[in-house]
Curated annotation (Swiss-Prot):
Official protein name in the record: Pyridoxal kinase
UniProt-annotated binding residues for pyridoxal: 12, 47
Binding sites annotated in the UniProt record for pyridoxal 5'-phosphate: 47, 234-235
Gene behind the chain: Pdxk
Family per record: Belongs to the pyridoxine kinase family.
Keywords: Acetylation, ATP-binding, Cytoplasm, Kinase, Magnesium, Metal-binding, Nucleotide-binding, Phosphoprotein, Sodium, Transferase, Zinc
Length: 312
């Protein structure tokens, strides 16, 4: 029997829908992981709806929760997973917790989605306070092992713009030098040979040989765009990448193929259901576009590969 693998996931929580911990816990549990969730916020629903209500966890409250685990000697983890955060002091507290957990378990893997912003029509903009960037760059990324920025976030962290695949890999090398051995740029506006209906994702994994030298595996994936606005996809991606890199630690190609293929199955099912609910010619609402997670259990568990990665 395989040993227990436990994840501490510090993310947002919604009562209705699938973002943050709600998007991460189910797939991780389906794939055999124990998940301990700290809810950085508790909202009625995600903020893409017309209204939402709820509470935000303060950094001191995060510290209290962690201390509770510590005094009971149950703060033993194999992975830490974090996503969207708006507060600088909360993010700094996360770093303190990760550092302490790594002192206890030097093999702990920290998976971080450095959520800061995105590009729309070629223009990048941040949707978190700007004072989070130096915390991510100088404190979070150096303790992270796997990071999943989009192109804009990779540019922010490295201080360099990406105009080509070559420049993207130069940026990823810079990010490797900052700390993480695995960097996946989850989406970019780089051109696809298959046309403008496709998004490019890039992955780079630095592996250490027994003699101390390193070898880097690089991959490229082309994914068909889905014409809808989904929320929670980045959280789902990071959780599944955690799971599949655990199961395929030296094969980023397979880990990314399984992650992205499962994502495609979830998104296609979601858009089919949303369109059917909305009715012909009607635009689906945020509630109708909530990820069909439970219905996609089999695809999450054993995804049919529908997106191939090219090793470069």
């Amino acid at each position: 029997m395989e040993g227990e693998c436990r994840v501490l996931s510090i993310q947002s929580h919604v009562v209705r829908g699938y973002v943050g911990n709600r998007a991460a816990m189910f797939p991780l549990q389906v794939l055999g992981f124990e998940v301990d969730a700290v809810n950085s916020v508790q909202f009625s629903n995600h903020t893409g709806y017309a209204h939402w209500k709820g509470q935000v966890l303060k950094s001191q409250e995060l510290h209290e929760l962690y201390e509770g685990l510590k005094v009971n000697d149950v703060n033993k983890y194999d992975y830490v997973l974090t996503g969207y955060t708006r507060d600088k002091s909360f993010l700094a507290m996360v770093v303190d917790i990760v550092r302490e957990l790594k002192q206890q378990n030097s093999r702990l893997v920290y998976v971080c989605d450095p959520v800061m912003g995105d590009k729309w029509n070629g223009e990048g903009s941040m949707y978190v306070p700007q004072d989070l960037l130096p915390v991510y760059r100088d404190k979070v990324v150096p303790v992270a092992d796997i990071i999943t920025p989009n192109q804009f976030e990779a540019e922010l962290l490295s201080g360099r713009k990406i105009h080509s695949q070559e420049e993207a890999f130069e940026v990823m090398d810079m990010l490797h030098c900052m700390g993480p051995d695995t960097v996946v740029i989850t989406s970019s506006d780089l051109p696809s040979s298959q046309g403008s209906d496709y998004l490019i994702a890039l992955g780079s994994q630095r592996m250490r040989k027994p003699d101390g030298s390193t070898v880097t595996q690089r991959i490229r994936m082309e994914m068909r765009k889905v014409e809808a606005v989904f929320v929670g996809t980045g959280d789902l991606f990071a959780a599944m990448l955690l799971a599949w890199t655990h199961k395929h630690p030296d094969n980023l190609k397979v880990a990314c193929e399984k992650t992205v293929s499962a994502m495609q199955h979830v998104l296609q099912r979601t858009i089919r259901c949303a369109k059917a609910e909305a009715g012909e010619g009607q635009k689906p609402s945020p509630a109708q576009l909530e990820l069909r997670m439970v219905q996609s259990k089999r695809d999450i568990e054993d995804p049919e590969i529908v997106v191939q990665a090219t090793v470069l």
